[in-house]
């Protein structure tokens, strides 16, 4: 056990920011299991089990994450300034937002849902400024560094209204107004930052060599802002009494969903290409398969509920099983690498 580690302290020293992507992925799988339990009732029990497991995961990961900033501050700070790894720092804040949604939808606990949402929203606000700031002032970023992982800060902002919109109706006065402001700020800032970065990432895809094998799963992150954006927008519209005409927002969600379907197919094709031509060795980036696809699965169900096109829900349910497969195989691989200590080697 942990034979690949020179010291047990390597667990803390090399605890990369992307670990919380596992919490994001498990949390969205729990929500999707609940959404599709109408097809298979046992999925409701699966959702509850995943929810409790995810809460445990969060606090397990939180310990080395905090200790790293205390014991190996230089390493933690170096990752925050790294042109690739820095984009994964917001995963801890997004994890809080996802857990907030889990507590509200699965745990039926508005208090803890609100606590995690508040922590996540504050964290995302800070990371949405810190991460781009270091990128903007850096003089060493190259085209090699561009990858869909850069979407994570915008995705985190877009995720804010998913649970935040469910909290809005329970507040009054200035707290209600502040929550509305935070939700619309999150979606607006995140969506337009995503559009800007989309152009940069597509530029890299077309005019540069393919992503390294270790970063190949990040192709799936393209689904993150689409799926989360649809879910967040629908939740905001449904919980904003001042929006009296909802249909234009619903139609935009449907159109945006179509863009997501294209990206789903492209991500599958690109993954098969890497598996066949370039290999796809395990890396922590495998967790990039999970949350973005899970967000798109959730968006499929919500779009179906509005337009009542059964084929959309069938597509979502089919992708749910792909999501479950990705999650299971990634969890098994990660557990094995944790046991051997390989995942804690220096990067």
From Swiss-Prot:
The keyword Transmembrane helix applies. It is a multi-pass membrane protein. This is Uncharacterized transporter MJ0576. GO terms for cellular component: plasma membrane. PANTHER family: PTHR31686, SULFITE EFFLUX PUMP SSU1. Keywords: Cell membrane, Membrane, Transmembrane, Transmembrane helix, Transport. It is found in: Cell membrane. It comes from the Archaea. Gene3D superfamilies: Voltage-dependent anion channel. The chain crosses the membrane at residues 15-35, 46-66, 84-104, 111-131, 149-169, 182-202, 214-234, 249-269, 283-303, 312-332. GO terms for biological process: sulfite transmembrane transport. GO terms for molecular function: sulfite transmembrane transporter activity. Belongs to the tellurite-resistance/dicarboxylate transporter (TDT) family.
């Amino acid at each position: 056990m942990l034979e690949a580690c020179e010291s047990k302290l390597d667990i803390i020293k090399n605890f990369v920011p992307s670990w919380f992507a596992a919490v994001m992925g498990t949390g969205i799988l729990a929500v999707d299991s609940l959404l599709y339990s109408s097809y298979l009732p046992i999925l409701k029990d699966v959702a509850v089990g995943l929810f409790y497991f995810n809460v445990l995961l969060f606090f397990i990961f939180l310990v080395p994450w905090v200790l790293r900033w205390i014991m190996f501050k230089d390493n933690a700070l170096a990752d925050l300034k790294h042109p690739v790894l820095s984009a994964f720092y917001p995963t801890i804040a997004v994890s809080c937002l996802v857990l907030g949604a889990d507590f509200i939808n699965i745990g039926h606990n508005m208090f803890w849902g609100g606590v995690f949402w508040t922590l996540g929203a504050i964290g995302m606000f800070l990371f949405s400024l810190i991460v781009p700031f270091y990128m903007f002032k850096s003089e060493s970023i190259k085209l090699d560094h561009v990858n869909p992982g850069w979407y994570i800060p915008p995705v985190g902002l877009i995720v804010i209204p998913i649970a935040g919109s469910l909290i809005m109706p329970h507040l009054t006065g200035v707290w209600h107004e502040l929550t509305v402001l935070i939700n619309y700020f999150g979606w607006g800032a995140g969506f337009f930052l995503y559009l800007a970065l989309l152009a940069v990432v597509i530029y890299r895809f077309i005019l540069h060599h393919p992503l390294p094998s270790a970063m190949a799963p990040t192709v799936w992150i393209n689904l993150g802002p689409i799926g989360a954006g649809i879910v967040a927008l629908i939740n905001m519209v449904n919980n904003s009494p001042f929006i009296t005409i909802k249909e234009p927002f619903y139609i935009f969600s449907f159109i945006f969903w179509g863009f997501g379907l294209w990206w789903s197919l492209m991500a599958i094709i690109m993954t098969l290409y890497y598996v066949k031509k370039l290999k796809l060795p395990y890396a922590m980036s495998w967790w990039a398969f999970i949350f973005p696809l899970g967000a798109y699965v959730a968006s499929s169900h919500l779009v179906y509920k509005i337009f009542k096109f059964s084929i959309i829900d069938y597509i979502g349910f089919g992708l749910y099983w792909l999501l479950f497969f990705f999650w299971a195989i990634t969890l098994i691989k990660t557990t094995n690498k944790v046991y051997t200590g390989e995942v804690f080697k220096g990067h």
